[in-house]
Amino acid sequence: MATFKDACFHYRRLTALNRRLCNIGANSICMPVPDEKIKGWCLECCQIADLTHCYGCSLPHVCKWCVQNRRCFLDNEPHLLKLRTVKHPITKDKLQCIIDLYNIIFPINDKVIRKFERMIKQRKCRNQYKIEWYNHLLLPITLNAAAFKFDENNLYYVFGLYEKSVSDIYAPYRIVNFINEFDKLLLDDINFTRMSNLPIELRNHYAKKYFQLSRLPSSKLKQIYFSDFTKETVIFNTYTKTPGRSIYRNVTEFNWRDELELYSDLKNDKNKLIAAMMTSKYTRFYAHDNNFGRLKMTIFELGHHCQPNYVASNHPGNASDIQYCKWCNIKYFLSKIDWRIRDMYNLLMEFIKDCYKSNVNVGHCSSVENIYPLIKRLIWSLFTNHMDQTIEEVFNHMSPVSVEGTNVIMLILGLNISLYNEIKRTLNVDSIPMVLNLNEFSSIVKSISSKWYNVDELDKLPMSIKSTEELIEMKNSGTLTEEFELLISNSEDDNE
């Protein structure tokens, strides 16, 4: 039985604040929602279930019941999931705020127990104190939290009562315990005080549950990668040829400087929290999805679908425009891909084609060449530490000759103006040389691959990990979407 879910169901009738905070989706009607086939704890109701992706952060951390409420731990609306969320670093004051939160929302005292007794003993068969009827009173205060690690300094902890055990290898979070950062004896005393108000029949169950959960060892934190995010929230703009992502957040006009101020209002100004929840709006943010994780994924797919036969062909057009040649056609893949990747692929394949045909005697794209597997490896190695080694292998497969102790290859360019300008810019020359050494060849390949992408400035993960305040600020400043999305292509092929 999910004690936290039961506590939310019964305690929601206690106060006006509880009616807002304890209204979770797990206690409502289930709606059909596809799940991610990942078993884990739902962060809103703390029960073990099949998880589905959240519309706020695109990570699977809610069950098919709670996803109906559209709540995310990155919202700025002070709902219960947000109140249980603490950002790194963890301090003793923040842990004390979590304990105060439990005592305010889920108190255990004589008045509360008598009220629940009157509610439960409406039937004659419910005179005894059985766990099935009083499970909501067996809610110990623990400092276990689900930890999300976006990077070394960007971590979020969602505190809750995570009962039982489950293999969370595919879940985006790990369960950690902060009892040592607080004070074991002090936390024991807090729970013993709560337990002393319970009927004798329930105290043993409370104590057993508390000691089992409060002494759990912490799991090793899991680094979140791009593959952990769902594809359901990704939107490909066919007009601008750029990927984007829909992010939905609960936004309120009330602001708090930090978490401590929010918890202070929870204790001293509950009406402010109620007003914030009543006036919050479910807001959609459309953000670009240009990040290093997506770049690596797209490069991997490009290498898989790449047709290296193009470097031996006589096609006059770009590699992405070939559609009637069974050895070179890749248009089916590039029709829904970022236009920058498409441009990079065209320039890279054209450059290798010009170099290869200038040095090796080849006839047609149907011929079998030893360089084909290397071209796939070259694309896969872009933006990795193996790039220099692969470029050298490609260079050595173009029959270089030694001139004064330096291996060089010939270069007879075709009619690609974009490639011509790119080589001039890279080598900083007025006219294109007809002979290239390894360093010049490598510089051109790296320049083509990094023409549109500065890896050092790219975020590692999607924009959906940003806080709601950051999204609002970026939207107001116009940086939520890219400047490239204003690009209008005049290519007849792009407008088909």
From Swiss-Prot:
Pfam family, one: Rota_NS53
GO BP term, pick one: symbiont-mediated suppression of host cytoplasmic pattern recognition receptor signaling pathway via inhibition of IRF3 activity
Spans annotated as Zinc-binding domain: 42-79
Ranges for region Important for cytoskeleton localization: 82-177
Gene Ontology molecular-function annotations: metal ion binding; RNA binding
Function in brief: Plays a role in the inhibition of host innate immunity by inducing the degradation of key host factors required to activate interferon production such as IRF3, IRF5 or IRF7. Associates with components of cullin RING ligases (CRLs) including CUL1 or CUL3, which are essential multisubunit ubiquitination complexes, to modulate their activities.
Record-stated family: Belongs to the rotavirus NSP1 family.
Domain commentary: The integrity of the zinc-binding domain in NSP1 is important for degradation of host IRF3. The pLxIS motif targets host IRF3 for degradation; however phosphorylation of NSP1 pLxIS motif is not required for its activity.
Name the UniProt record assigns to this protein: Non-structural protein 1
